[in-house]
């Protein structure tokens, strides 16, 4: 993919896996990804920030549990507080208006995408499970250490174990990117994107979905993308609306302080 053709990706929630049937009767395993009200929150520009990018927000967060600085950040964009914020670098002509909502038809069936997420944690794992080692022999002098990794180095020279040596250790819970996954189907009304095969992470986790860096498979893609602007959406969120939603939490926090001040005045 050329730098000047780079579109924004989206952040989606992994709902789980299913299967769909092809015309020849074969079944295709698919992962269901949900675009939960993905909106543009802010822009990064080359003049101000040194690079061009879009900041996207997805999901709903309670205003009373959102820090005041972030409430102002969302109110400036006229969007409700978001649970997840992600940034995607884009070409200058691929910037999308702040407040716009990206839709599922941003991706086209048949195109290739890259999906990044946090893999499922497996805890401490041995070398056979973690790296696929074959282990040691079952007999002929091997005792207890059948599943060990064996020698970790050479002789007195170099006399050390090199960094990055494949050994037992913590497995999973790291960022993983699966490349060149095919988009099978999209549902604009439900905000659903079906991709072929498995993607990193557990059900309910967040993943980043973007055009494949190694090519989109020759499919014509909409530029700068498919979205609904603020004018096409419902009434935009203003700063007053966000602050009013957060007012009960601020009042609860202020009540103990007021009570403490009253007790001090009575004692005086």
Curated annotation (Swiss-Prot):
This protein's source sits in the domain of life called Bacteria
Q: Where is the composition biased (Low complexity)?
A: 242-259
Of the GO CC terms on this record, one is:
cytosolic large ribosomal subunit
Q: Which InterPro entries match?
A: Ribosomal_uL3 (IPR000597), Ribosomal_uL3_bac/org-type (IPR019927), Ribosomal_uL3_CS (IPR019926), Transl_B-barrel_sf (IPR009000)
Single GO molecular-function term? structural constituent of ribosome
Sites bearing N5-methylglutamine, chain numbering: 156
Q: Where is this region: Disordered?
A: 242-268
Post-translationally, this protein is described as follows, namely:
Methylated by PrmB.
Entry's Pfam families? Answer: Ribosomal_L3
Q: Which UniProt keywords apply?
A: Methylation, Ribonucleoprotein, Ribosomal protein, RNA-binding, rRNA-binding
Q: Which residues cross the membrane?
A: none
Q: Could you give a single Gene Ontology term from the biological process aspect?
A: translation
> How does it associate, per the subunit comment?
Part of the 50S ribosomal subunit. Forms a cluster with proteins L14 and L19.
Q: Which family does it belong to?
A: Belongs to the universal ribosomal protein uL3 family.
So what does this one do? One of the primary rRNA binding proteins, it binds directly near the 3'-end of the 23S rRNA, where it nucleates assembly of the 50S subunit.
Q: What name appears for this protein in its UniProt entry? A: Large ribosomal subunit protein uL3
Which species is this record about? Maricaulis maris (strain MCS10) (Caulobacter maris)
Q: What is the lineage of its organism?
A: Bacteria, Pseudomonadati, Pseudomonadota, Alphaproteobacteria, Maricaulales
Query: Which gene is this protein's source?
Result: rplC
């Amino acid at each position: 993919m050329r730098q000047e053709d780079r579109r924004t990706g989206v952040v989606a929630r992994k709902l789980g896996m299913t299967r769909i049937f092809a015309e020849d009767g074969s079944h295709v395993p698919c992962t269901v990804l949900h675009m939960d009200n993905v909106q543009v929150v802010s822009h990064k520009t080359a003049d101000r920030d040194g690079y061009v990018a879009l900041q996207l927000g997805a999901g709903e967060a309670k205003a009373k549990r959102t820090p005041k600085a972030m409430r102002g950040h969302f109110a400036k964009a006229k969007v409700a507080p978001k649970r997840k914020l992600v940034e995607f670098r884009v070409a200058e002509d691929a910037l999308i208006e702040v407040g716009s909502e990206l839709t599922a038809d941003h991706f086209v069936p048949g195109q290739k995408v890259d999906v990044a997420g946090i893999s499922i944690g497996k805890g401490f794992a041995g070398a056979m499970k973690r790296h696929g080692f074959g282990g040691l022999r079952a007999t002929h002098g091997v005792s207890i250490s059948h599943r060990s990794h064996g020698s970790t180095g050479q002789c007195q020279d170099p006399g050390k174990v090199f960094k990055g040596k494949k050994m037992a250790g913590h497995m999973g819970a790291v960022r993983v990117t699966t490349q060149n996954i095919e988009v099978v189907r999209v549902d604009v009304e439900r905000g659903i994107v079906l991709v072929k095969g498995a993607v990193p992470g557990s059900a309910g986790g967040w993943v980043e979905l973007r055009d494949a860096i190694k090519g989109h498979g020759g499919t014509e893609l909409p530029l700068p993308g498919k979205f609904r602007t603020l004018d096409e959406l419902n009434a935009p969120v203003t700063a007053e609306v966000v602050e009013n939603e957060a007012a009960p939490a601020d009042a609860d926090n202020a009540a103990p302080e007021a009570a403490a001040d009253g007790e001090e005045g009575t004692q005086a």
